[in-house]
Amino acid sequence: MSHEGQEELLDYSDSEEIAVPTTTEVAGADSATDKEADKKGSYVGIHATGFRDFLLKPELLRAIGDCGFEHPSEVQQVCIPQSILGTDVLCQAKSGLGKTAVFVLSTLQQLDPVPGEISTLVICHTRELAYQIRNEYARFSKYMPDVKTEVFYGGTPIKRDIEKLKSKDTCPHIVVATPGRLHALVNEKAIRLSNVKSFVIDECDKVLESIDMRRDVQDIFRATPHQKQVMMFSATLSQEIRPVCKKFMQNPLEIYVDDEAKLTLHGLQQYYIKLEEKEKNRKLSDLLDSLEFNQVIIFVKSTQRANELNKLLCSCNFPSIAVHSGLPQEERIERYRSFKEFNKRICVSTDVFGRGIDIERINLAINYDLPNEADQYLHRVGRAGRFGTKGLAISLVGSKEDEEVLEKIQSRFDVKITEFPEEGVDPSTYMNT
């Protein structure tokens, strides 16, 4: 459904975008009460539809049932009916509303696996996210035994990828990859993309804002057929990047589930604690001692600080695990898997865990160091309170710069972040019963 990418995507003319009314907006139009509920981020009117109403394959419905999902989220209800028809989709929706399931389910619904043919291509900007998306495909295709999915990313031997792609027996129908590795495979003529029917970019703003990644994506895009479905998703999608995304598409369905002023997280309590830099370790120890949580992720600004804080926590009898870009690739994946499997309850991380990574048990996010950008705050704290569940986010504010970032966050997302109360927080307000 898309035309070939242009050589220079920066040369575009702005076109008017029409935000598609979401189900919540329609439901909220019925009464003042509904409008007020919608303002607070509630799920007004979205449970009227079940996954069965989408007329999905029985194998998909069975897998969805095994996952315990009964009703689609807001973004799923709006997107899936169009995406399974092959419509190009540009979707921005806040963290935790199941955007990944939209393209996983719609591509599996349309997939008719042919040995040796790649039908679906999914591009994302980090290896961890690629690994996670692959797992989502495995989860929803469990009753589709003929479907093969592979993940390709840098930091691993490319020869292994080439060997998998050579044989009809091992060549996947679905490829999830980072731009650099996929571009290398295209250059090596090791991957055949002439049968691609679905072209997906997850966290598309992050991929296309980087000039290097964008060039890689353009080259990859040109290696795919003229006629195909293109879908792009992100939690944040600025007005500037939207036209760039649309250059890859033909008449896309544009879905902005929440406008930019309301990109807050339903069910997530957000607080800050003002203190000196030297007081952070003591305060963090107090929080971990006093707060109830399933799993916690602690964000720091550098790999060095991640290692140092992880070492300190372990020495203070807080068994933790550190995940950051300074680790060898296999080790990063192994630590990510270990944390996801609940072998450790505390994870110290840089922003490598700040986007798209989904670990359902996390219900506490602590910004030991605040991010430099307001948008990154959303992706970080979005690790807690996924899928509309409760969660708690606490930011340690230790400098004038931190105070400025906090102001930007509150202004950007139209949210009031209050000071953490001295008496603490009632666990029932952020722990799911």
Curated annotation (Swiss-Prot):
Q: Cellular location of this protein?
A: Nucleus
Sequence motif DEAD box, location on chain: 202-205
Catalyzed reactions per annotation = ATP + H2O = ADP + phosphate + H(+)
**Hydrolase is among the record's keywords:** yes
BP term (GO), one: transcription-coupled nucleotide-excision repair
Query: What positions carry the motif Q motif?
Result: 49-77
Domain Helicase C-terminal: start-end pairs: 267-428
Its keywords, alphabetically, are: ATP-binding, Helicase, Hydrolase, mRNA processing, mRNA splicing, mRNA transport, Nucleotide-binding, Nucleus, RNA-binding, Spliceosome, Transport
- Which cellular component, as a GO term, is one annotated location? spliceosomal complex
- Spell out the Pfam families in the cross-references: DEAD, Helicase_C
Family of the protein in this entry: Belongs to the DEAD box helicase family. DECD subfamily.
Which intervals hold domain Helicase ATP-binding? 80-255
Listed EC numbers: 3.6.4.13
Q: Which domain of life is it from?
A: Eukaryota
Q: What is known of its domains?
A: The Q motif is unique to and characteristic of the DEAD box family of RNA helicases and controls ATP binding and hydrolysis.
Q: What is this protein called?
A: ATP-dependent RNA helicase SUB2
Disulfide connectivity for this sequence is none
